[in-house]
């Protein structure tokens, strides 16, 4: 789990996302509160529940990007889901409990990586012995002389192996077969039976080992993973993963505005209000049955986001509104924001295009006037047509760089300067003509 302070988290987010300080501060505090809660004594810790967040803002202002970056910073089980992918229990489609099952799978993978790192040294030693056995098979009759000769030879080969002198030599080794497993499609409400059937097939064991011929460098890598997997206790792994989900899990639900009820409808609203009703127990706290065990959702942090262009937060059912107490409004982007997006973030758009063209031997230089004009063009198109936020920059940049990208392979050694004149020559007609910009930009 991340031990970064809120200020450090915001600083990391600033490297990738321009503006939106309120949203950054809210998620930073929420993430830090996970750490603070774990410092309390057990009795009080159980009473402290996470304050779930609802992020509200137009499309393309950074809601999803904040989630993506937060996932890397959290160092905890994290899953991002689209609210529109789910339907009410009892109808065809994914039910919301699948969110917790997927989150638990993520935790299992995360915990397995941590546990395998802990026993990596022992795994490397075991893998080394298996490679040496393939290079120098142990004698069947273990006479003293043979044993001494073999031991000295093994030490010589061990030294060469560690120095990388044998990396390209080919050997034949037995590689463990994959775990036997069967994916079972089940109707809603039958997940428990499905999990039991999957466990039954998994208990049948692994497929038999196969003898393969490969280079020592590749063989060592596979054998280390295989030996590390043997050293990890699977039951302990599941217990730790479930504990990790329950205490540190984070769920990001995108497009939650798309499941708001719109006007009066006849018949059951299974993909909107029905999904909201199913989300209630998850957000409030319930127990979900997964193939790894029972998972309590009481202390999982939920962050929801939506543009709310065709609806408003009050269109969510009141019970769900009450379970998302922290509201954060993200601001629409201005032309000056677009300019900063083009230059300031790590691996900015201009930096990406410069690096891509450099692979063809073409030098690209973006002047300040050129960047100003690109930002202004993107903002103008957003104002005149549909406002899609920073995503408009991708469309404008791709259109601007189209000719250079096509001809770059034939113009190695050339240099192009993207200034205001170049931008005007390539984009002015499209930006000024509303019909063209609507269909092309």
Swiss-Prot record:
Region annotation (Disordered) ranges: 137-156
Alphabetized Pfam families for the sequence: AAA, AAA_2
CDD domains: RecA-like_HslU
Record carries keyword Cytoplasm: yes
Subcellular location per the Swiss-Prot or TrEMBL entry: Cytoplasm
GO BP terms, alphabetized: protein unfolding; proteolysis involved in protein catabolic process
UniProt GO cellular component terms: HslUV protease complex
Keyword check for Chaperone: yes
Keywords of this entry: ATP-binding, Chaperone, Cytoplasm, Nucleotide-binding, Stress response
Main location: cytoplasm
UniProt: ATP binding residues: 18, 60-65, 254, 319, 391
GO molecular function: ATP binding; ATP hydrolysis activity; peptidase activity; proteasome-activating activity
Family affiliation: Belongs to the ClpX chaperone family. HslU subfamily.
Assembly and binders: A double ring-shaped homohexamer of HslV is capped on each side by a ring-shaped HslU homohexamer. The assembly of the HslU/HslV complex is dependent on binding of ATP.
Function: ATPase subunit of a proteasome-like degradation complex; this subunit has chaperone activity. The binding of ATP and its subsequent hydrolysis by HslU are essential for unfolding of protein substrates subsequently hydrolyzed by HslV. HslU recognizes the N-terminal part of its protein substrates and unfolds these before they are guided to HslV for hydrolysis.
NCBIfam families: hslU, PRK05201.1
Name assigned to this protein: ATP-dependent protease ATPase subunit HslU
Organism, as annotated: Shewanella amazonensis (strain ATCC BAA-1098 / SB2B)
Name of encoding gene: hslU
């Amino acid at each position: 789990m991340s031990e970064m302070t809120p200020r450090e988290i915001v600083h990391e987010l600033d490297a990738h996302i321009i503006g939106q300080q309120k949203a950054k501060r809210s998620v930073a505090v929420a993430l830090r509160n996970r750490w603070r809660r774990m410092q309390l004594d057990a009795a009080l810790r159980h009473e402290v529940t996470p304050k779930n967040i609802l992020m509200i803002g137009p499309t393309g202002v950074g809601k999803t990007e904040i989630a993506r970056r937060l996932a890397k910073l959290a160092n905890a089980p994290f899953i991002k889901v689209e609210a529109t992918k789910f339907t009410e229990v009892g109808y065809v489609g994914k039910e919301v409990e699948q969110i917790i099952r997927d989150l638990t799978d993520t935790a299992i993978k995360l915990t397995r990586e941590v546990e395998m790192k802990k026993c990596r040294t022992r795994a490397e030693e075991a893998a080394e012995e298996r490679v040496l056995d393939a290079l120098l098979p142990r004698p069947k009759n273990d006479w003293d002389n043979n044993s001494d000769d073999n031991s000295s030879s093994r030490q010589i080969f061990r030294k060469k192996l560690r120095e990388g002198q044998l990396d390209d030599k080919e050997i034949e080794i037995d590689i463990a077969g994959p775990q036997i497993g069967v994916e079972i499609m089940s109707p809603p409400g039958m997940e428990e039976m499905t999990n039991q059937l999957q466990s039954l097939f998994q208990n049948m064991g692994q497929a038999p080992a196969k003898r393969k011929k490969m280079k020592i460098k590749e063989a060592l890598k596979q054998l280390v993973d295989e030996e590390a997997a043997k050293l990890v206790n699977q039951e302990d792994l599941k217990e730790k993963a479930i504990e990790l989900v329950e205490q540190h899990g984070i769920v990001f639900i995108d497009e939650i505005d798309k499941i708001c009820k719109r006007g009066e409808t006849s018949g059951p609203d299974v993909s909107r209000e029905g999904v909201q009703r199913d989300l209630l127990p998850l957000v409030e706290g319930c127990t979900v049955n997964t193939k790894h065990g029972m998972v309590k959702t009481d202390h999982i942090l939920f962050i929801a986001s939506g543009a709310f262009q065709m609806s408003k937060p009050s269109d969510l059912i009141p019970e769900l509104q009450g379970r998302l107490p922290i509201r954060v409004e993200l601001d629409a982007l201005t032309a000056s924001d677009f300019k900063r997006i083009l230059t300031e973030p790590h691996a900015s758009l201009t930096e990406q295009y410069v690096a891509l063209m450099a692979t063809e031997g073409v030098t690209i230089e973006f002047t300040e006037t050129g960047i100003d004009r690109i930002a202004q063009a993107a903002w103008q198109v957003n104002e005149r047509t549909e406002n899609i936020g920073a995503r408009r920059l991708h469309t404008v940049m791709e259109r601007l760089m189209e000719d250079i990208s096509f001809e770059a392979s034939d113009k190695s050694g050339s240099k192009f300067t993207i200034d205001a004149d170049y931008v005007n020559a390539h984009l002015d007609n499209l930006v000024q003509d509303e019909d063209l910009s609507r269909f092309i930009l």
